Amino acid sequence: MEKNPRYVEIDYAKYAPDIPEDQLEAYYGLPKHVQFCNECVMSNQKPNSCYEFEHTINSIKKTMVIQEDGVCDACHACHNKANGHIDWALREKELRELCDQYRKNDGSYDCLVPGSGGKDSFYAAHLLKYKYGMHPLTVTWAPHIYTPWGWENMQAWIHAGFDNYLCTPNGMTHRLLTRLATENLFHPFQPFILGQKQLAPKMAAKFGIPLVFYGENEAEFGNPIADNNSALRDEHFFAVNDYDHIYLGGVSLRQLEEDYKVDKADLAIYLPSETSNLEKNHIQVRYLGYYEKWHPQGAYYYSVEHGGFRPAPERTQGTYSKYNSIDDKIDDFFIKTCFMLQFRDIKRVGQTADIQNKIRLRWDAELEAEGHDCQTHGALRAAVLVEQVADALFVLRGGEQAGIDGII
């Protein structure tokens, strides 16, 4: 294996504080003018989901749209869920009809749910089995390094009544791809995301399971709002016809084999399915969130009640929740890279002044306790779209009584 030098000369003049705005460079296709959503304070620097196996250092990103009213697509998606734009009774009827069409009673699986045993995958699998009478197989792409509570939640998921296949990739290859993804893309989570998106359709084809259900559509978090108009997931996320233009960790398959001496067999697990194979097996990949009125904190409460879900002992780095991104010990590093690249942190789509003020007071206290200057970290605090803000807003809009202290 050849050495891969990382030292790069930096022209610090590009980053001088007195450069006129029109002369500043924008990278990765991110908008030059930074704009914040009027409701959730997420910026237009948030990239949309991409086809990970096409991701290189030169990739140009499409980013979250902030519409003419100053409100982002994610917030508009939230409004559509809450204000009657969606007939949820009709959506549930569609789901029941879909399940009736594919339900098997011969002892075989009729749907597949990928996940870690976190709140969303637990909620999805449990609903499908115990509400809709389906027979799901669950599959898990292992995190880089399990946290104790991540592993316990995985076991709780299984013991709530689900068969599970845990896929743990070759440690040597996984470490290499994680390092390359960090050095080339500053994206340490890419090897995990590759498996997260591609394992389920592969397993469905292998077992002849026609339906795959993910939870929320990424349009909930800022992808184009039009994506919410269909229950089907864009197959380009997990299937290709051409393997000649695939990159892992920002490196081509050919370079991985020739320069890094990685065997093809050790890379196969990361590769997307062949489109023809999925078509031959009639595999459909759908979002359960299209049919169910998905709410993250509601999924958390559900998983606690029905499966003993255990939150992390401390809040996820840079957020106010203890149940998001808690399975992997490198989650915190990934969150930091997101902030550094795109001035963003864990997503959410709602805000009210009163709730924000109360949260900021608590956030300031925690920053001070950790020895940070709150003034310096003000931008970080403003950029964080906290889970509990959206959850509190959801409750308030629904006319329910809930104290902010009980939510955060």
Name each model feature, range by range.
Residues Y123-A124:
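Hydrophobic positions on the alpha1 helix immediately C-terminal to the Walker A/P-loop
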Residues E370, C374, E387-D391, G406:
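Residues flanking N-terminal targeting/processing segments that define the start of mature chains
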Residues T376-A383, A390-A392, L396, A402:
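Short linear motifs in low-complexity or flexible loops
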Residues K119, V386-E387:
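Residue-level micro-sites within transmembrane alpha helices that shape
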Residues M1-C111, L127-G371, R381-V384:
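Nucleotide-activated chemistry modules centered on ATP-dependent adenylation/adenylyltransferase
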Residues C111-D120:
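Short, glycine-rich nucleotide/cofactor-binding loops
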Residues N357, G378, I404-G406:
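Serine/threonine-rich, low-complexity intrinsically disordered segments
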Residues I359, W363, Q388-L393, G399, ...:
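N-terminal regions of proteins, emphasizing targeting and processing segments when present
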